[in-house]
Amino acid sequence: VSNAFWSDLSAAVFGKAVPSYSVQGSGHLPSFYKVSDFAEASVGLAGVALARFWDGGADQVLVDRRLASLWFYMTLWADGWKASGLWDAIAGDYQCRDGWIRLHTNAPHHRDVALLVLGTKADRAAVAKAVLTWRGVELESAVVAAGGCGAQMRLPHDWAEHPQGRAIAAEPLVHWDDHGVCAPTAAPEGPSLRGLKVLDLTRVLAGPVATRFLAGFGADVLRIDPPFWNEPSVEMEVTLSKCCAGLDLRIETDLEHLKQLMREADVFVHGYRADALDRLGIGTEVRRELNPTLVDVRLNAYGWSGPWVNRRGFDSLVQMSCGIAGLGMELSGSDRPKPLPVQALDHGAGYLVAACILEALSARRKGRLKSAKVSLARVAHLLMANRCEWDTSGAIKQIPSDFNATVENTGWGPAHRVKSPLQINGVTPH
């Protein structure tokens, strides 16, 4: 296929551009960026990485462009019940004295911080009134300093001149660390990831997309959350085919339990801020001592260098920071920020993380140890290099035939899932 993203993605993961996948389906998600091209290439990347792990090649990989675009959104069609809303009542974009800012308040402790900084009650109108009294950069700094999540809307040229924007532009798409050798491991048995133990310390949305992909092909994924964390609006998306448990890593016994899980795992994927595990006493060197052959892949929001390396962030905030939402507003003539039609940074980064995990596992089979780091902001940098015109002809929207006919009995009620966008030699996720 001809895809603007393939050479960059494949070179970042495999060290060189490799033959591409096959594609079927058509259409696109209307945007000022090539979002559907990115969705197709991201799913294809993970598929090719899995085919290589199974000693196959890209010629075995078939991606459905339409379905890949739909898998960049919510994939479940509730039958007779209604899923929770995606956003907290306070979360969203607000006008400030000199532009716009986005507050991310889905987590109760992040909402509490925003309200404390603003000195107002949990009422959207009151929050909007309070935000209007602030300059954007000052409110962003105050919320972040207090432990919350917010992002001032910038334009691409603002981000290019910002210290963090410059740092991101200088980073590779994937930070690889070739850190040792080991005894070669056995080849997998057949087209499956059965028996692969994946320890998942990630939250909405990129990391869970990566581990959902692995779980779909049979990996044993154990997701660990702190007791205070809750994702009711996306649980049916991010816990598919996984086991879930809770640990409070501030408690010594729970931390020791996590260490034991690390010793037993094949893969550890985590999305905490860059310094979080170091502060818990389980930094990179400690993890390698616990399990020398552990495949360790990390994800964060704002990259691995620069002044924002430890900043909290989510897809919607990165879109505001780097200029995606601002440029969308400018080009569309909208009176408010216009982000991507889907959280493409999260989903694209998720499939990139999955591909990195599989490539590191392929290296381990040959006796080489590799770890990787990925960020939403660097994924955004790639996407922003691939602009397009807004076009609603051929726009992709969910229709009943996009969903599996088989009922999926979830913990919330019966539902239908969007069909798989990927086949590898005829094998699809289950």
Model feature map: region roles:
Residues 1-228, 255, 259-264, 287-303, ...:
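Acyl-CoA thioester-binding alpha/beta core of soluble enzymes
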Residues 199, 243-289:
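A structured beta-alpha segment of the ubiquitous adenosine-cofactor-binding alpha/beta core
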Residues 203, 249, 273-274, 300-301, ...:
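Short glycine-/small-residue-rich Rossmann-like dinucleotide-binding loops
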Residues 208-209, 232-233, 249, 259, ...:
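Domain-scale recognition of functional cores that engage charged ligands
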Residues 218, 241-242, 265, 314:
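Short, well-ordered alpha-helix to beta-strand connector turns
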Residues 219, 223-249, 257:
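Glycine-rich phosphate-binding loop and adjoining beta1-alpha1-beta2 segment
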Residues 279-326:
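Rossmann-fold NAD(P)-binding glycine/threonine-rich loop
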